[in-house]
UniProtKB/Swiss-Prot annotation:
Signal peptide region: none
Name assigned to this protein: Acyl-[acyl-carrier-protein]--UDP-N-acetylglucosamine O-acyltransferase
EC top class named in words: transferase
Catalytic reaction(s) noted: a (3R)-hydroxyacyl-[ACP] + UDP-N-acetyl-alpha-D-glucosamine = a UDP-3-O-[(3R)-3-hydroxyacyl]-N-acetyl-alpha-D-glucosamine + holo-[ACP]
Organism of provenance: Cyanidium caldarium
Location relative to the cell: Plastid, Chloroplast
Length: 269
């Protein structure tokens, strides 16, 4: 049975599923849809064209689906926010709807901690942990199984590869390669994310291929011909066409065409 606190304001046109809980003083707008068993804490505002799936927990003070901080945004744009299932969104998180007829997207099984900001048009996949006070600028993409440490800041249009880890207080201005650990201001790629790869059951064979690809990128990091390395990945018989290699090489190629990727630490001479 749906339970709406007497002080909450839920627009009659809003769609609430079975056993939804809406806490004290929360406000649910007219274009909002909330799936079964989702719990909304006190003092939460959900507005705009926002769709929230099932079994989510949204704690006090969150503001979801509000107008993007984009000076080009026009009120008539049909933008929205989509949040999947089984997400835990902690206190005072802000998530803005998209601009330019797009959708801000948050997938499934994510933990977004206190005071985080997810800007317009961000795409957050699945099984991601975003620690306290992380700020994602517009159009950031985070692939699945990423961990982001507290107070990190991500530049707009950055793409974070799967199974990577960003250390606390890092400044992310370029793409983060899959399967690595980055840290620093500005960030530097430090090492392979071996703990994360093992945790998600990546095979030893795939880990060895990933190590080999990363070692290739470490060679003369300030002078290598990135396109030649990409072609080597595509043609080298040693790198079999498994999922990890395909994903890494595609990510690398797209990074060359866009923002580039965070470089490796250069050893001191």
């Amino acid at each position: 049975m749906t339970n709406i606190h007497s002080t909450a304001i839920v627009h009659p046109a809003a769609s609430l599923g079975r056993n939804v809980v809406v806490g004290p003083y929360s406000i649910i707008g007219s274009d909002v849809s909330i799936g079964d068993y989702t719990r909304i804490g006190p003092h939460v505002v959900i507005t705009g064209k926002t769709v929230i799936g099932c079994n989510n927990q949204i704690l006090s003070g969150c503001i979801l689906g509000s107008v993007p901080q984009d000076l080009r945004y026009i009120d008539s744009e049909l933008t929205g926010l989509y949040i999947g299932n089984n997400n835990l969104i902690r206190e005072n998180v802000t998530v803005h709807r998209a601009s330019g007829n797009g959708v801000t997207y948050i997938g499934n099984n994510n933990l977004i901690m206190v005071n985080c900001h997810v800007a317009h048009d961000c795409q957050i996949r699945n099984n991601i942990i975003i620690s306290n006070s992380v700020s994602l600028a517009g159009h950031v993409i985070i692939d699945s199984c990423v961990i982001i440490g507290g107070h990190a800041g991500l530049h707009q249009f950055v793409h974070v590869g799967a199974l990577s880890m960003i250390a606390a207080m890092s400044k992310i201005e370029k793409n983060v390669l899959p399967f690595v650990v980055v840290s620093g201001m500005p960030a530097i790629t430090r090492t392979i994310n071996l703990v994360g790869l093992k945790r998600y059951g990546i095979s030893k064979t795939d880990i060895n291929y990933i190590r080999l690809m990363l070692e290739n990128l470490k060679v003369q990091p300030l002078a290598f011909d990135t396109y030649s390395i990409f072609k080597k990945f595509k043609s080298d018989n040693l790198l079999k066409r498994n999922v990890a290699v395909q994903y890494f090489s595609d990510f690398l190629f797209n990074s060359f065409r866009a923002r580039g990727f965070i470089p490796f630490k250069v050893p001191k001479k």
